[in-house]
Amino acid sequence: MATPQVKDLVLRSPAGSSDVISFAWPLQIGHGQDKHDNGIDIIDTIKFVCDELPSMSSAFEETNLHQIDTACYKTMTGLVDRFNKAVDSIVALEKGTSLPAERLNKFAHPSLLRHILQLVYNAAVLDPDKLNQYEPFSPEVYGETSYELVQQMLKHVTVSKEDTFIDLGSGVGQVVLQMAGSFPLKTCIGIEKADTPARYAERMDVIFRQYMGWFGKRFCEYKLIKGDFLVDEHRENITSSTLVFVNNFAFGPTVDHQLKERFADLRDGARVVSSKSFCPLNFRITDRNLSDIGTIMHVSEIPPLKGSVSWTCKPVSYYLHVIDRTILERYFQRLKTKGGNDHESVGTVRTTRDRAKREANVGQHHHNNHHSNNHANSNNHQRDREQSNGATATAAHQQRHQSQSPANVSGAGIVLAASGQQAASKTRQQLQHQHNQQQRSLDMESSTESDGDATNGNGGNTTTATNTTSASNGPMTRKVWSDWCSSKGKSSQSDDEENNNSNSNGGSNGGSIGGGSVGRQARATTQKKRKKLTRKAAIASKSAAAAQREAEAAAAAAVSVPSKESSSKEDPPRAASAGPGRKGRMKKGARGRKSLKIVGLEALHKQTVLSTSLDTMTKKLPAAPGTVDQQLTALLTENMSHAELDIPTAPQDTPYALQILLDVFRSQYTSMIEHMKSSAYVPQVQKQIAQEQERMARLKNRASQLDKQIKVLIDDSVALLKVRMNELGIHVNSPNDLIAQAKEIVGRHKDLQHTASRMRNEVTFYEGEQKLLLNKQLKNLPEYQKLCGTVNGKVKLEVPPELSETTAQELVLKEIANTLSQRKKLYAQVSTIEQETSVLQKTAEERSTAATLLAQGTNMIVSTGSSSSSSTTVCASAVTAQSNKLNSVKNSRRNREHRARSQEWPEVPEVGKIQESNPEVLAQKIVETCRQIEAGKFQGAGAPSSQVNGKNKAIIEVPPPPATAPVSIKSSPGHHYKDTTLMPAPKQQQQQQMTLSQLPKCELPGLSTSRKQESPKVANFEDRLKSIITTALNEDQEQRSKAVESSPSPSPLHSPAPKRSKQHPAGAINPAQSLPNNLHNIITVSTQGLMHLNANTTISPITPPLPGPGAGATASTAPPPPANLPYGAYGGAVAKTTISGKYQAAKEPKYSPVRQAPLPPPPSHMASLYPAGQQTTPADLGYQRRRSSVSATSYEHYMVQQQQQLQQQQLMLAAAAHAAQRQQMRVEEQQQQQQHQHHHHHHHHHPQHRLPQHVQHQHPHQHHPNEFKAPPADSHLQRSSSREQLIVEPPQTQPLELLPRASSANSDYSGYRIRPPSRPSSNSSQPDYTQVSPAKMALRRHLSQEKLSQHVTPQATPPLPGHGGAPTSGKTIGDLVNGEIERTLEISHQSIINAAVNMSTSGASFMERAFLNERSNDRLLINLNAQRPERVHVRPLSEESQDPQPTSYAQERGPGLGAGGAAAGGNSNLATLAHVAYAQKAQGGARANAGTAPPATHSSSARSGRDYQPVALPRAELKGSIEAYFHEEQQQKQSKGAGSAGSSSLRGPRLNGANPPLEGLAASLQDHVRARKYKEETEERQRRAAAAASSSAGPPAGMELPTHYAHQAPPAHSYHHHGASINGTPHKVELGIKRSSPLAPHQQPPRPSKLAHYEPPTTQQQHAHAHLYANGQVLPPPPAHDATTPSPTPSSSSSSCGRRSNSNNGKLLVDPPLLMSPEINSLLGDERPLQLSHHQQQQQQMLHHHQSQQQQHLQLTQQQLRVAHLGHGLSHGHSTMPTLGGQRNGNGNAADDVNDLATQRTITNYDPRRRLRTTLSGPTKLSAAHSNQNLNGYVMADSSSSCPTIPQ
């Protein structure tokens, strides 16, 4: 059963420590003897804490701590919780008081310390069994010492603060920790060698400190060291220690000896405690052991303690050694003072040695102590004896001895009194002197002996009764033995003397004072004392004692002197004193003999004597009973007597036979006896013996031979075995080792067998695989078929058993040859393509020149007139046809792609994947790669990229380019050819797209954009990057301004318009214009394609490939879009379009996967060819422009572009009719083609189908390739429409939605270009372009430099309307990359908010289409210099504006507006960063288209550029500086939450001006009031635009910049200006304002309040798109969108409001007419830009209105279809259709869509751009995914990956 998860039991510290004691559940751990219950530890801990804190005990009064069930979790938890509460309360009460200090930081009580150590040990020693895993009988034997033993040791040892403790072999360190916790020692050190204990010691250290802190107890410093204490590094620690503990019980002699060497260096007074003594307890110094450690230490035993150690339960003694070198010093001092008295010194030593035997004599302690004194003072004693008479001397001498013993003092006094005054006086002096000396030597004497000897009894010779027992224990030496023998037989006398001595001794000890007894007592005491003094002297006198016993007492006394002199020279004092009293001498001798009696000594002597006597040797005594010698016979025969048996008489009846037998026996015995008696018997026996001996010899010889043979064999076999083992590398010395080695060999052999078998299996397997592969390969080879032949017409299935080597080589060679031939073909194709590319580049240059010229006049006309007429016509026809076809084919594909893209990061085209660590080199490589792409090196790849996504295929399918080509041919044959090249037949493009998808290397940014859009990383580098990019952008702006000046009208248009102009010429330009448009498209395509790459791949690999100056111009123009491109494939599509018709179309598919939905916009350039492209152009151009300007990050450049665009717009107005005609023709062709292609795409995008159908169809199929071509609109649409268009295949329905989005995007991007919604959305769907890498910065520098050189020329080159993008293309790849980097750096929350606002304005793109066209100019005029902070809102807005709408709208718009619209729409859809990227591309295309149709295209392009530029503003800066941003962002956040549920309602109020915290978009779209003001301002702008149009030539640069600002501050920005005037507009305005003026209105009062730059003409399409531009002027239609927009604003303000609002309409609504920031207004000064933009917008609006009406009709129809498809899926969830607003379901639907977006933020309807926007938010992605499912792939749910996600 699984144990339930329970928490550990934690005890909090009563000391207020942060440390806690935790116990894991269950508390019972271990098993068997090691089982332990931690619950008991918890209870004990609580008890100890209660003891420490009496106040704690009250908490446990009701609890019986002794009866707690430790196995009950609930009980223990309650106990612990109660304890913790009590502890917390006490700690809290004591906090700040002196109470803690009183009870804390003190040493623990021994019992508490023991508990702590037990806790520590239990916690640290996880597996006690491991401690016992050691080698037996090694120095690493582990044993633990108990706590009690250490405590006992401490009782015997006094410690101080200066002491240092060291534990040698500390184990786990518990002794060290106990010492550290017990006393304030100086330091404690533990050294342990074994690994396991040392490892546990580390844990003990940590846990001990923790627990001591928990209890609040002190402990001294300590260290636990792992190492060998015998190494030199630890010698210092040992020698400096004053207290050493060593458990040396199992160390062994070697380690003990090394320890002795170290202990010899210890300081005096050091204590060593060990479990085995280092010297004997009774150690005595002799001249033979002076080097022993015992000479410098006292040894004593610590009483054994039971259970003191872990290895045995028996008591174990420990020994205390005290280092004292004075012992040795005193020994030598004695030798020195004794001089030549060797005998005395020797006697002293002997006496010292015997002292241990006398320690048992209790009363003799002082006698023994004074032996040395007697010896030392022997000379004095001798003098005393000589000077005094015998009695006096004896008495004095005796008294001297007695005086040393308190018991004898009285007796000594009596003797002194009896001996007289003289003797007394001398005796006193002598006694005093002797006493002093004895006192001085007392310690010395005792120290030389063991502590046991300290209490000395009488020496072995004492005769005292108490000494008799001890005497028997004396050592038996030869002298003692001989003396004993000599005194034998006189035992009686000896006994008498012993008795006398006993009596006298007893009398003296008892203190009796009898007269006679006094003398005897004194004499006996004296003799005894003297004998004790020198045992040698006593022994020497024993021979004399024997004579004394034989003679009388006097005679014996006389004999004692010579015997003493002869036998003992060492005792002259005794001899002298014995002179008068020989009797005492004899007693002494008797005492000596008696004392020599030892137990069994006599028996031993007797046996010795008997054993040596001869007769004893001969005489054998009976054996002792029971011994082996005792014989059995002795026992048996003792009682046996022998009796003769009587011979019985012969029986009478003996049988005869028996008698015969007995006779035979008898005769035989008798004969044998006789034989034995004969003389021959002996020789016979001897002979037999000899024979047997000989036989035995033979047998022995044989045995020896066999033994030798065996030995030889063994030796030989052993030798051979060793040789063999050496050969095998086995070196062993024992059989066990050999067996072990053999086992290893066997094991290895088995392993090898297993390995071999496994390898055989693998080889068999691989052979089978090889055969299968060979079979498979050969089946396809005709050679194999020939070899194997056929059976019944079938190739043999079996591979030939083996191919001959020759055959195999031939086959391989043939394969190689085939491969080489194929490679040659490919190389040939590449060379052909390169040639075509060079031709295209030349043609592009020519076109750029022509485009510059045409842009001034033709583009405007073409964009306007062609846009409306051709877009309308073509939209209906082509879109319808293509929508059916494309939707069916592409919807499924897009659905899959949308799903995949939404979940995946955009795949960076391999073209962009450059491995280089050096940023400079990487930048160069990127530029080179981009150039190669521009040059068409990746053209082949471009076509395949169409396969990458259905969207791209649609673009590839753009067969209309041929139509465009003819038109272009009119302008210039080369251009026409290029256009055709740019747009190969749909099928070819589809194939190319397939190829592109297959060629990740060439994957255009469009592809990567969708993925990258998913991960906008805009956060941290903004400020830094802002400054860097600002500088670079300023340079770019200057260059661009110069370039623009060189080609004023084309450049501005081209800077943003290249993309648009591409689209615009394609869609709206007349045949005459279509040539320039085609040129411009080519330029824009290359630019946008590059931009697309830039957008997609931060690497911006595509950017470098700008084909030529025209492309460069486009690139310069497009770079801003490329910057935005990262947000969408739109820019990429444009750039690709610019590169070349075919290759761009081919390449575009690669990149377009991201923008597949936006594919329709690519037709922007194709717009001239295709109505869809035309329709998208204005919005796309506006979007692209805004993007371009944004990407350029040079508002000046945008202003110039805007001015140029205004001029171009005028020209386009003139050429609009011609362009429109051509575009209509082209559109019709394209629509037919697209409808055919779009038919596949249409399945997915019915709304798009119609207008965008061709474009979309082309886009889906050729979108990737077209990304270079048509990406302006296509990219824009790809973002907004590649999803939305695909979704809304009916161009009008989708265009309406797309246009609302595109419009919003345009108004955001074009009109409101100031905000680059795509940028803001970058954080949701687009890669984080704010994350600028060193490589990107280096690339930007390179591109900047190139821009400086190329910018002027390209812009000058593309003055033609068709080249409207050419001047822009004057921007080099550097421009594109710089724009991208700038965008990256400029992304800010404000930009996101602006993007959101733009997206909301995108919702109004229907109305805004024409309005956007004008507005693009206005915005360019107004917002050229708009700060990038607005970029944030730009992307989100574009996203919400729903790329699909811009696509549809762009398509609807016609050539000029179509491209711009597509770009704008893309921008709207780019509301997410991804969408922004697409929008950028769209903007680029829009710019190109704007070149074609300068007014609409320029405004759109400028807007897109601006829109992108605002994105470029760092969010952080915006956020910090723009108050509106904060308000809006807050509102966005708030409305996000609310918006989810009632996003539409919330959005309405926000757009309506509800002041709830204005979140980024909410502030931007704050109120309808703002929208009204936008309307008012728009009207003003329209008036200004009219004035500007009249004076468009005058203010091109200035106006363009203001317009750019305006478009940068698009819907949201303009709306903000209104808001500034109104409630929340200031916030929006601030958002719209460039980062330089976060709070433009406040910061830059000079700038007039931003005015909605929607031009009055907008009203037509603004009304159509006005609801989309709800932020702008057309609020009524957008209210839903507005409502939606605010919701998006909160939810996707950062991401993309409009996009999120799912109301491009709402976005467009939010995209109010571009409000001119004070700076912009001031810059604009005059309203001519507005007027121009207004005029252009009016013209475009008219065209767009017409187209939009048609498109709306188609789109509405398609939307209805989509509503069926998507509406059911998205619309019900997100009102996807409403996003398009009037285009799809009407404003209400748009509002619903917006609401859904706000709610889920994923409702992109089916609009690709919208999807992109959706990418910003997870909810959006989810809803998008949901929508995709419901919408048959139309859903753009995943904004980030929406473009790719859109089924194609």
UniProtKB/Swiss-Prot annotation:
Residues 419-428, 1697-1706 have a biased composition (Polar residues). The modification Phosphoserine is found at S491, S492, S494, S1318, S1324, S1325. Keywords: Chromatin regulator, Methyltransferase, Nucleus, Phosphoprotein, S-adenosyl-L-methionine, Transferase. Its EC number is 2.1.1.360. It holds the Pfam family DOT1. S-adenosyl-L-methionine binds at residues 142-145, 165-174, 192, 228-229. Residues 339-360, 1574-1583 have a biased composition (Basic and acidic residues). Residues 19-336 form the DOT1 domain. Disruption phenotype: Lethality is observed starting from first instar larval stage and animals do not survive beyond the third instar larval stage. Severe decrease in total H3K79 methylation levels and developmental delay in third-instar larvae. RNAi-mediated knockdown causes a severe decrease in H3K79 methylation levels and lethality. RNAi-mediated knockdown in neurons causes lethality while knockdown in glial cells does not cause any observable phenotype. RNAi-mediated knockdown in the developing eye causes a rough eye phenotype, which indicates a change in photoreceptor neuron composition in the eye. One of its GO terms (molecular function) is histone H3K79 trimethyltransferase activity. It is found in: Nucleus. Residues 338-537, 558-593, 886-908, 960-996, 1033-1075, 1165-1190, 1221-1333, 1345-1374, 1432-1463, 1486-1508, 1529-1559, 1573-1604, 1637-1713, 1731-1757 are annotated as: Disordered. GO terms for cellular component: chromosome, telomeric region; histone methyltransferase complex; nucleus. Residues 507-518 have a biased composition (Gly residues). Gene3D superfamilies: 1.10.260.60, Vaccinia Virus protein VP39 (3.40.50.150). Broadly expressed in most tissues. Expressed in a large subset of neurons and in a small subset of glial cells. It catalyses: L-lysyl(79)-[histone H3] + 3 S-adenosyl-L-methionine = N(6),N(6),N(6)-trimethyl-L-lysyl(79)-[histone H3] + 3 S-adenosyl-L-homocysteine + 3 H(+). The keyword Methyltransferase applies. Belongs to the class I-like SAM-binding methyltransferase superfamily. DOT1 family. This is Histone-lysine N-methyltransferase, H3 lysine-79 specific. It comes from Drosophila melanogaster. The gene is gpp.
